[in-house]
């Protein structure tokens, strides 16, 4: 059973890795939209709320769709002041507890509560109240999709932590850095 769960975890990891890498390009798109908007506004005195809202949509996509990717790479903000004093097994148990009782319930609740908002916007073909009339449902869809990716990655991380505690897989959180990078980091701190 655990081998099948570990395979599922690897599949979830691969999906979030691919989504994250694809969404990186939206940062460039947001920068380009912002630059074109500023250039049009200051050069030709043309301004459009649609361009500003498009920037907002792109930023929302980056923020929401990369949450699972960020969790995959253990880059979410956490307070390590206390946990750094614990053994690795204790840290893993804290991660299991936090994932089961905080991350997953919160992500499931947000998914569940945001789905009707998306459906309402989709069925009513809701548009922006600002000039430009961008449809709102794509931005509303980002919320449940982003939290689905985050909760799936949370399940993957839970599987990996339990696999580690059972001795079935190595610690996936160990940082394996390039020795040259470690030497540079050591030199920089001197």
Predicted regions and their residues:
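Alpha-helical transmembrane segments and membrane-interface helix-loop junctions
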Residues: 1-190
């Amino acid at each position: 059973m655990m081998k099948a769960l570990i395979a599922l975890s690897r599949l979830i990891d691969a999906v979030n890795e691919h989504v994250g890498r694809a969404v990186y390009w939206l940062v460039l798109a947001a920068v380009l939209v912002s630059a074109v908007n500023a250039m049009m506004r200051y050069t030709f005195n043309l301004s459009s709320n649609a361009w500003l809202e498009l920037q907002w949509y792109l930023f929302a996509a980056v923020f929401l769709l990369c949450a699972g990717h960020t969790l995959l790479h253990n880059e979410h903000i956490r307070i390590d002041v206390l946990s750094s004093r614990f053994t690795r097994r204790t840290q893993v148990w804290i991660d299991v507890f936090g994932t089961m009782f905080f991350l997953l319930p919160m992500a499931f609740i947000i998914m569940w509560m945001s789905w009707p908002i998306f459906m309402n916007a989709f069925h009513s073909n809701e548009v922006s109240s600002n000039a430009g009339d961008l449809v709102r449902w794509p931005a509303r869809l980002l919320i449940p999709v982003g939290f689905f990716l985050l909760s799936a990655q949370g399940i993957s991380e839970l599987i990996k932590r339990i696999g580690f505690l059972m001795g079935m897989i190595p610690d996936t959180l160990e940082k394996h850095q390039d020795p040259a990078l470690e030497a540079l980091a050591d030199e920089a701190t001197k």
